[in-house]
Regions:
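Short aromatic/hydrophobic "clamp" motif used to bind/position activated sugar donors
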Residues: 83
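A short, conserved beta-strand element in the Rossmann-like catalytic core
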Residues: 43, 91, 117
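Donor nucleotide-sugar binding loop of glycosyltransferases
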Residues: 19-22, 44, 67, 93
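A conserved acidic beta->alpha catalytic loop
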Residues: 41-49
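Acceptor/aglycone-binding surface of glycosyltransferases and processive sugar-polymer synthases
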Residues: 63-65, 69-77, 95-166
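N-proximal low-complexity "stem/linker" segments adjacent to membrane-targeting elements
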Residues: 1-29
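Active-site acidic Asp-centered loop
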Residues: 42, 86-88, 113
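Acidic donor-binding/catalytic loop of UDP-sugar-dependent glycosyltransferases
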Residues: 47, 86-103
């Protein structure tokens, strides 16, 4: 699973809130490949933080101001040159980390955003709420692409990788 980067170069940041059901499995799947795994806990009411620590992650509390701020906490708390951001709900496959960091390693990008619209995601299977979320993400992607002349397909996806300097 691990790409050709040196140990300690990649930090995995997981934003979590009330994810006790799967956080341990996610961290266990990452631990053999990545040394620095930080869970930014959104003041969970369940055992998310304890289970994350038990699985080998370092846990820090977010400041309660939303996911963007939780990402900032994770960035401050990690040391890697490349930071991988994942949701704790199991919607992102750790086996895809080498693919998402490759453009950064090859100096082709400073930021890579995963896309649920490119295939391989089962997150869009579901009810009306899921459909509305997909429509909102699509609309926002169109607006951002028009404004910044980019070619993004899923700007709201939490599976990302970024160079620290970005």
């Amino acid at each position: 699973m691990r790409s050709g980067v040196l140990p300690g170069v990649i930090s995995v940041i997981i934003c979590a809130r009330n994810e006790a059901g799967g956080i341990g499995r996610l961290i266990a799947s990452l631990k053999p490949y990545y040394e620095e795994i930080v869970v930014v806990d959104g003041h969970s009411k369940d055992e998310t933080a304890a289970l994350a620590e038990q699985a080998g992650a370092r846990v820090v509390l977010d400041n309660g101001r939303g996911k963007g701020d939780a990402y900032q906490v994770g960035i401050r708390e990690t040391t890697g040159e490349i930071q991988v951001f994942m949701d704790a709900d199991g919607s992102h496959d750790p086996a895809e980390i080498p693919d998402i960091i490759r453009p950064i390693e090859q100096d082709l990008a400073d930021l890579v955003i995963g896309s649920r619209h490119r295939g391989g995601s089962d997150e869009w299977q579901g009810d009306v709420t899921t459909w509305l979320r997909a429509m909102g993400s699509g609309f926002l992607s169109v607006v951002i692409n028009a404004r910044w002349k980019s070619n993004l397909t899923d700007v709201l996806n939490g599976f990302r990788a970024a160079r620290r300097s970005a």
